[in-house]
Structures are given as structure tokens and as C-alpha cells.
């Protein structure tokens, strides 16, 4: 009799246990929340104000991962320096299996895939392409579809629920993108300068050229000679908008303001929760679109 009572008491907890999801970034956590809603619990390892290339593999993260069903990452080696050590340190069989880490970027038509041999002399180059798809709303919609399928595999009873939510999110992203594209086109801004190649997908989606970075090479801090070259290019090509990711110091921005008349330098978030008031993927893209609009002719 006691055994039967214990089974009955434990059944609700088993039946309604929520999936425990970890993401490497706040951007992915925001998408997972849209797809999973009240049927999942999710936490992001990197903060929205952190450079996802450089996150400390803390023991506290390993403890959290011990009860996690799945880790979702952007991939393409963005988090490779720390996510694998964290997973191994957690000693969670669910995560060390081949399906424990779900990397998204490779499934989302990556851009800027380098050709030929790659050496460290070229900076922090990602062999599989640029991993920063979080600033492209269309790819975020596709990511939601991939996430819904994986969550449905883990919890088949909620498969239709996850799929419905992913469809809704993707539709919203598609509709918002059309409006954002119209606004950027109306702004007249066709080219910007950025610190790192974080904006490549954003620029590609919104038809903005962003071939000039303040970094001489990916992951290499700006040098005096390179900044002189950047200023020359900006004057020659009449670029008057600079977006500096708030992950990096912006002392270079002051120099650009001194050397280039009417230049607009904006320090902006590039992840959800990267600054107050940016708690969703939509709010992040909106923030960046407004930053571009501020540089209108």
C-alpha cells in the first residue's frame, strides 16, 4: 500500500517535469523561451554583456549542467574554448552523448567561410564561417524551427506545442524584418564601420555594406596605423556611421569623432540583455535599426 501511495504522489512530478535547457548565449535563451514557453526551463551561460568567445568555465556552471537535458550553442567554434570543458566537467551522460550539444550556426547557411589554408596570423578566424547569426531575424526564425524539432524529440508529448510556437515566432520575425528593411532603406545608410565582424549577418540581411572593421584582424585590438587607414577609408567612401559593440572598449570612437566631421558613433548591444531594455531578440534588432537610423543623411 505504501508503495502504491508513493508512486501516485511521485507521478505528477514525473509527468509534468519540464525540460532543462542550457544555452551558451542569451540570444539563444530568448529563442528557446519563445519556443518552449512554460514547458521548459532555460538558463544562459554567457551574459549578454560578455564576449561569447571568452567565457570562464566556472565550476558553478558545471553544477548547473548536471541536471540539464540539452545544451544549445551557436557553434562554428564561437564557444569552443569553454563549452566542451564545461560539458565534460558536468559529468552528465545526457550531455556527453552525441546529441547532448546542439550547435545551430552550421545549419543556418553560414557566411564568410574562409577559403584556402588558415593560420593564426589571420587572427581569430572561424573555419566554418561567421557564427554571429543572432543579429539576423530571418535566421533566428529558422533557428526556432530547429530548436522546436529538437525539443520535440526530447519531449514528444509537447511536440505540436513547440512547433506552433516556433511557427509563430518565425512569422513575427519575417513580418518585422520587412518593416526594418524599409526603415533602413529610408535612412539612406548604405555602409557602416564596426569593431568586430559581429554585424555581418545583420548587414547582409539589411543590405548594408560593413567591410571595414576597427580590428585590423579578428580578435586583434586596433592599432594606430590601422585606425589611420580606417579614417582614410571612411572619408573616401563617405561612411558616417560607426557601431561599436559594447563588449569592447570604445576609446577609438572618440578619435573618430575628432577626425571625421559629422560622424555618428554608437556603442550598442549585440546580444539580448546586453543593456537595460533589451530583453528579447526583437528588442535587440530594433535597437540596432534605430542606431542605423540615427546616422541618416
Task: Map each language-model feature to its residues.
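Positively charged n-region of N-terminal signal peptides that target proteins for export
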Residues: 1-4
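N-terminal signal peptide c-region/cleavage motif recognized by signal peptidases
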Residues: 10-12
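Extracytoplasmic metal-acquisition and chelation regions
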Residues: 18-297
Amino acid at each position: 500500500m505504501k508503495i502504491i501511495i508513493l508512486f501516485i504522489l511521485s507521478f505528477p512530478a514525473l509527468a509534468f517535469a519540464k525540460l532543462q535547457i542550457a544555452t551558451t548565449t542569451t540570444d539563444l535563451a530568448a529563442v528557446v523561451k519563445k519556443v518552449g514557453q512554460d514547458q521548459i526551463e532555460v538558463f544562459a551561460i554567457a551574459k549578454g554583456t560578455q564576449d561569447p568567445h571568452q567565457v570562464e568555465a566556472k565550476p558553478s556552471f558545471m553544477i548547473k549542467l548536471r541536471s540539464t537535458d540539452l545544451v544549445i550553442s551557436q557553434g562554428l567554434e564561437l564557444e569552443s574554448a569553454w563549452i566542451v570543458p564545461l560539458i565534460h566537467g558536468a559529468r552528465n551522460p545526457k550531455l556527453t552523448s552525441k546529441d547532448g550539444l546542439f550547435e545551430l550556426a552550421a545549419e543556418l547557411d553560414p557566411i564568410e567561410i574562409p577559403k584556402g589554408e588558415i593560420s593564426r596570423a589571420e587572427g581569430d578566424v572561424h573555419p566554418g564561417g561567421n557564427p554571429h547569426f543572432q543579429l539576423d531575424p530571418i535566421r533566428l526564425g529558422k533557428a526556432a524551427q530547429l530548436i522546436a524539432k529538437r525539443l520535440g524529440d526530447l519531449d514528444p508529448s509537447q511536440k505540436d506545442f513547440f512547433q506552433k510556437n516556433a511557427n509563430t515566432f518565425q512569422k513575427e520575425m519575417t513580418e518585422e524584418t520587412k518593416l526594418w528593411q524599409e526603415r533602413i532603406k529610408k535612412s539612406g545608410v548604405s555602409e557602416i564601420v564596426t569593431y568586430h565582424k559581429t554585424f555581418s549577418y545583420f548587414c547582409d540581411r539589411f543590405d548594408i555594406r560593413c567591410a571595414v572593421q576597427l580590428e585590423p584582424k579578428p580578435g586583434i585590438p586596433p592599432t594606430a596605423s590601422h585606425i589611420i587607414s580606417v579614417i582614410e577609408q571612411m572619408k573616401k567612401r563617405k561612411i558616417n556611421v560607426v557601431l561599436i559593440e559594447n563588449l569592447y572598449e570604445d576609446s577609438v570612437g572618440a578619435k573618430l569623432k575628432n577626425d571625421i566631421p559629422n560622424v555618428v558613433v554608437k556603442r550598442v548591444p549585440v546580444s539580448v540583455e546586453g543593456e537595460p531594455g533589451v530583453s528579447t531578440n526583437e528588442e535587440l534588432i530594433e535597437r540596432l535599426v534605430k542606431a542605423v537610423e540615427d546616422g541618416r543623411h
